[in-house]
């Protein structure tokens, strides 16, 4: 039986093959939700995913999106600062801007098509991890660790970080790692993907006094259907995709 596997592609089956009875891994509609931050965050909110408080700008005011509810009529003065503006289709941190106060945000807003952005409360948690997951669980994980000479230290991406594997002592698995995995799987399910990457941001294992935390607060940042993969990552994906195809036979 023919299988179509999408890692970021939106190409429908009929443009790939005349055969309609095919196995699909990551359907186009799931990728569409995952790649658009507004659609993705709506899916998170509807499914009670542990994620940052977020807002859109509509009809001259900000709207906060909450599970089963909206809070309307919010002006820039009442937003939780610092706040992030995020391009709905930006990747790898592109299109993201940190606004420390109302003045910064108002200056940035001038001349922008604000419907192309979402806005998130900024959580300055010390660590970020990427979990590669299926709806069964995780199969590959990395810690993003900032380079010592990184200038902008409010975000983590491939330019200012190195990637630390789970076997490395610096990985420093959080005490509530199972909760993190559970939320990442739920996030993947909420957007409809079969396989993909989920980024989380989380508190460090110790508090400011050096005491071990009993739990580490965290948020799910986003899902990704086309993550950058090393040779090792590609091998892991190949094995998991084969499993997914066999399961759907």
Segments from the language model and where they lie:
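C-terminal active-site "lid" helix and adjoining low-complexity regulatory extension at the edge
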Residues: 189-193, 202-249
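Phosphate-binding site of ATP-dependent enzymes
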Residues: 97-187
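ATP-grasp fold ATP-binding core
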Residues: 44, 71-94, 114-126, 142
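Anionic group-transfer/hydrolysis microenvironments
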Residues: 8, 88, 122-123, 132, ...
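Protein kinase-like catalytic core scaffold
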Residues: 83, 139-140, 196, 217-222
């Amino acid at each position: 039986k023919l299988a179509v596997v999408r890692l970021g592609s939106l190409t429908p089956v009929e443009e790939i093959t005349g055969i309609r009875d095919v196995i699909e891994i990551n359907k186009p509609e799931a990728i569409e939700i995952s790649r658009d931050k507004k659609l993705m965050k709506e899916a998170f909110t509807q499914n009670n995913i542990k994620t940052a408080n977020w807002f859109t700008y509509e009809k001259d005011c900000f709207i906060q999106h909450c599970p089963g509810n909206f809070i309307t009529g919010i002006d820039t003065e009442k937003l939780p600062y610092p706040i992030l503006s995020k391009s709905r289709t930006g990747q790898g941190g592109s299109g993201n801007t940190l606004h420390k106060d109302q003045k910064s945000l108002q200056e940035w807003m001038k001349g922008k098509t604000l419907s192309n952005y979402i806005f998130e409360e900024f959580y300055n948690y010390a660590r970020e991890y990427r979990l590669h997951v299926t709806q069964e669980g995780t199969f590959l994980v990395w810690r993003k660790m900032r380079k010592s000479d990184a200038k902008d230290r409010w975000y983590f991406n491939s330019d200012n970080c190195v990637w630390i594997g789970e076997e490395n002592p610096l990985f420093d698995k959080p005490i509530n790692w199972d909760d993190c995995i559970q939320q990442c799987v739920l996030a993947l399910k909420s957007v409809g993907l079969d396989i993909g990457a989920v980024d989380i941001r989380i508190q460090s294992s110790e508090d400011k006094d050096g005491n071990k935390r009993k739990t580490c607060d965290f948020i799910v940042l986003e899902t990704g259907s086309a993550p950058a993969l090393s040779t090792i990552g590609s091998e892991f994906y190949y094995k998991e995709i084969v499993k997914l195809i066999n399961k759907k036979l």
